[in-house]
């Protein structure tokens, strides 16, 4: 298993590739010029010159719906070579015009060298308050991860989080689904403008509330796969040799995929009868990742997601196998299937059965 890389977020609007519906036909236009010489007085016949230059008119799709890694729309670098979201979308348009234009194949040879610009109305972040490293380190900050039971969020920019999460009642509903963030008498929930952070595919935001008369500060971690960049009326301008200068508009949606790399999980050693160690469900229950009622085991999906760093999937126990060199170590294998509406970074949504970790028994 790969170890999940840490990414840092500075703020910005939050491309892969699937999709898409469209309605505009392929358009190819020709420009001709003809010059004639009817003679030069020495008896030579006239010559006709005819040159023709063909240019392709881009036919934009009315809806562009893509799935891919966060890196397709957000550059985690912080230096001067960092690319904006607009620049990343332009790069994808040039590399994959078929995802944006009904005549993408006809454009492939000319759009790579064309001038393409994108205007999504992206704005600078308003999360300019106290830095994440400061507010999150305070001793009384409660930490929790956005529940799989909560909905995906469509945003035009990162600033939308202050509105799309909803009013106090809506944010309370989100927090009440997270054991660590549920308050006994919670009121006055709101998203602050304190700094954000992106770490291990989680976007951390600061939520405050009151528990009775006590002020509460929370670190709400939202999996990036819960975020969709949705721009109604994305403007695309195209010009260049062999391509008709065009000002185009489309409705753009980018579904950030699930990164299938996992964190290294090393749970503490537990006691379990040797005869039960090959029962993956019993092992998970013993480790605290499942509950049992009678003979029915229920996996704690949110707890497994946090432990593995793999979010918005349904986990199922597959097997538990003894290590060939250590009788007290067993490899527990799980199957992970993206929830409805979610995809892996490669755009697929089939199950992966190679999710595993080592359990140690004493």
UniProtKB/Swiss-Prot annotation:
InterPro entries per record = Lipoprotein_p35 (IPR011653)
* Changes after translation: The N-terminus is blocked.
Q: Where in the cell is it found?
A: Cell membrane
Q: Does the keyword Signal apply?
A: yes
**N-palmitoyl cysteine: lipidated positions:** 31
Tell me which residues bear the S-diacylglycerol cysteine lipid modification: 31
Q: Give the keywords, sorted.
A: Cell membrane, Lipoprotein, Membrane, Palmitate, Signal
Q: Where is this region: Disordered?
A: 33-53
Q: Where is the signal peptide?
A: 1-30
Q: What's in the GO CC field? A: plasma membrane
Provide the topology term for how it sits in the membrane: Lipid-anchor
Record-linked PROSITE patterns: PROKAR_LIPOPROTEIN (PS51257)
Function, as annotated? Major M.penetrans antigen.
The record's family statement is: Belongs to the p35 lipoprotein family.
Misc note: The dominant B-epitopes are found at the N- and C-terminal regions.
What is this protein's name? Lipoprotein p35
Organism from which the protein derives: Malacoplasma penetrans (strain HF-2) (Mycoplasma penetrans)
